[in-house]
C-alpha cells in the first residue's frame, strides 16, 4: 500500500479523497491554488502545497506544478479526482513517466475511451449496444454525410469526438440544416477540444440517462456496482442522481452490467469507471465512458456498501478487488442532490462569503461538502459546493429523508439551488420516478411562464 498520495484536485472531491487516505493510514498531500488557501482540506492537511494562482490553467491544470509538488513531498501516487486532469491521457502518462502511480486507468485506456469514436468502436467489438449512427468519424464529403443521415434517420445529433460534459453537440432535424451543423460543430470541437473530428448518432426523443459503475483491478477481475439514474439534467449537467433506477427490470440491468464487465476485461481496464447509456423503450444505447470517479459515486456507495474511492486506491496499489460480483448486493434506495452556489432558477453563479452553514443530519443522511461558516466561495471554479445524499429502505423513504434534509439545510450569504431541490422533491412526476432527460428543462420553462 502507498504511504503518501498527492490529491490533484479541489473542493468536495479533494476532501473525499483525503478521508479515504486517512482510513487507509496513508498521508495525503493536498495541492491548492491561491484562491483555495483557506479550504477545509488544506487546513486539515498534514502537507499542503500551493501550485499557482487562482486560474485553473495556472494551477489545477498545470501539469509541471502538480508533478513538482509530488516530487518535493515524496508522494508515491497521484489521485486526479474528477474534472481538471482526471481524463487527460497525457497527464496520466507524464505522472507514470515521472515515477508515480496514477490512480486511475492506464493512459492507453483513457485515450481509447476519451475519444468518443474509438470508444464506440471498442464497445461495438465488446458487444455493448450503441446508439445507431456513423461507423466512425464523419467524412468531409457532403454527399456521404447526407447519405449517412438518411440511413440513420432524422433527427440526428452531431457530436465532437473529443467532447464531453454536454459540450460539442448539435441536434439536426432536417437535411437542409445538416451540412452547416456539421461544419459548425467541427469548428467548435477544434477550438474547444483540439480535435475537430465529429460523428453522427440517431437523436433519441425521450431517453433516460442510466449509467453503470464498474471497478476493475490489473488481474482482469471486474465487477459492476449496479446502476444510477441521472436523468434530472439541465443543459446536459446532472442535478439529481439516484440508485437504483426506478422501474427498470433487474434482468435488463444485469444483462447490461455483465456486458460492461466483459468490455472492461477486453480492453484491460483498471480502476473505477462508468458506462453512460441512453435508455428508451426497454433498450440501452452506449454513449460514453468516464474513466474516473464520478461526482455521483456516493449513491452507489450507499446502496452497495462499497467504498469506491478506497477501492480505487487499493487497486492502483496493485491489490486485487476485495470482493466478487456475487458479493455485491444492492440494498434500499439512495438519492443525491448537487448543491450549487447559484441562483436556483436563473442559474447565475453566486460566489461570495458563506455567513451561515448548517448541514442536515439524521438516519441515512450523508453530506459531502468542503464548505464551512465564513468560507469564501471563489468565482474561479465550478459552482458546486457540496452534495446531500440520503439512503432509505425504499425510494419513498429516501424521498422523505431528502425532503427533511433539504428543509434542515441552511446556507446564508450566497444563493444556492436548494429551493429548486425542495420543489423537485415534491414534484408529482419525479416522485413517481422514471422522468426522461428533458423533463427538468421542460419543468423549468413551464415554471417560468
Segments and roles (model prediction):
Residues 1-126, 138-147, 397:
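ATP-binding N-terminal substructure of ATP-dependent carboxylate-amine bond-forming enzymes
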Residues 133-134:
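Conserved beta3 strand of the protein kinase N-lobe
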Residues 7-23, 48, 71-73, 96, ...:
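ATP-dependent carboxylate activation and anion-phosphoryl transfer catalytic cores
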Residues 148-157:
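Acidic/histidine-enriched active-site and ligand-binding environments that engage anionic O-linkages
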Amino acid at each position: 500500500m502507498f504511504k503518501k498520495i498527492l490529491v490533484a484536485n479541489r473542493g468536495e472531491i479533494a476532501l473525499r479523497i483525503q478521508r479515504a487516505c486517512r482510513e487507509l493510514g496513508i498521508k495525503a498531500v493536498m495541492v491548492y491554488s491561491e484562491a483555495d488557501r483557506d479550504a477545509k482540506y488544506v487546513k486539515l492537511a498534514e502537507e499542503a502545497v500551493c501550485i499557482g494562482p487562482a486560474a485553473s490553467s495556472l494551477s489545477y491544470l498545470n501539469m509541471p506544478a502538480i508533478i513538482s509538488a509530488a516530487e518535493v513531498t515524496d508522494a508515491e501516487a497521484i489521485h486526479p479526482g474528477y474534472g481538471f486532469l482526471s481524463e487527460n491521457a497525457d497527464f496520466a502518462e507524464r505522472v507514470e513517466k515521472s515515477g508515480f502511480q496514477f490512480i486511475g486507468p492506464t493512459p492507453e485506456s483513457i485515450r481509447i475511451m476519451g475519444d468518443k469514436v474509438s470508444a464506440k468502436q471498442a464497445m461495438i467489438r465488446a458487444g455493448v449496444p450503441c446508439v445507431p449512427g456513423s461507423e466512425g468519424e464523419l467524412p468531409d464529403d457532403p454527399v456521404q454525410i447526407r447519405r449517412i443521415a438518411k440511413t440513420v434517420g432524422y433527427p440526428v445529433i452531431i457530436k465532437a469526438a473529443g467532447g464531453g460534459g454536454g459540450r460539442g453537440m448539435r441536434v439536426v432535424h432536417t437535411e437542409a440544416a445538416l451540412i452547416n451543423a456539421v461544419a459548425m460543430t467541427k469548428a467548435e470541437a477544434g477550438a474547444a477540444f483540439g480535435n475537430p473530428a465529429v460523428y453522427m448518432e440517431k437523436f433519441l426523443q425521450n431517453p433516460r440517462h442510466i449509467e453503470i459503475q464498474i471497478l476493475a483491478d490489473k488481474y482482469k477481475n471486474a465487477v459492476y456496482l449496479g446502476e444510477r439514474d441521472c436523468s434530472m439534467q439541465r443543459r446536459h449537467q446532472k442535478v439529481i442522481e439516484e440508485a437504483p433506477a426506478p422501474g427498470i427490470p433487474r434482468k435488463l440491468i444485469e444483462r447490461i452490467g455483465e456486458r460492461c464487465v466483459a468490455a472492461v476485461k477486453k480492453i484491460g481496464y483498471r480502476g473505477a469507471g462508468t458506462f453512460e447509456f441512453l435508455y428508451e423503450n426497454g433498450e440501452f444505447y452506449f454513449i460514453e465512458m468516464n474513466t474516473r470517479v464520478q461526482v455521483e459515486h456516493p449513491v452507489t456507495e450507499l446502496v452497495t456498501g462499497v467504498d469506491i474511492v478506497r477501492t480505487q486506491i487499493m487497486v492502483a496499489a496493485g491489490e486485487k478487488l476485495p470482493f466478487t460480483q456475487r458479493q455485491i448486493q444492492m440494498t434500499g434506495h439512495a438519492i443525491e442532490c448537487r448543491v450549487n452556489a447559484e441562483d436556483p432558477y436563473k442559474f447565475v453563479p453566486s460566489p461570495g462569503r458563506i455567513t451561515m452553514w448548517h448541514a442536515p443530519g439524521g438516519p441515512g443522511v450523508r453530506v459531502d461538502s468542503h464548505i464551512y461558516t465564513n468560507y469564501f466561495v471563489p468565482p474561479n471554479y465550478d459552482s458546486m459546493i457540496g452534495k446531500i445524499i440520503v439512503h432509505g429502505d425504499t425510494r419513498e423513504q429516501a424521498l422523505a429523508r431528502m425532503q427533511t434534509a433539504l428543509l434542515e439545510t441552511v446556507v446564508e450569504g450566497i444563493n444556492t439551488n436548494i429551493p429548486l431541490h425542495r420543489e423537485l422533491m415534491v414534484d408529482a412526476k419525479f416522485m413517481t420516478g422514471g422522468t426522461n432527460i428533458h423533463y427538468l428543462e421542460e419543468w423549468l420553462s413551464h415554471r417560468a411562464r
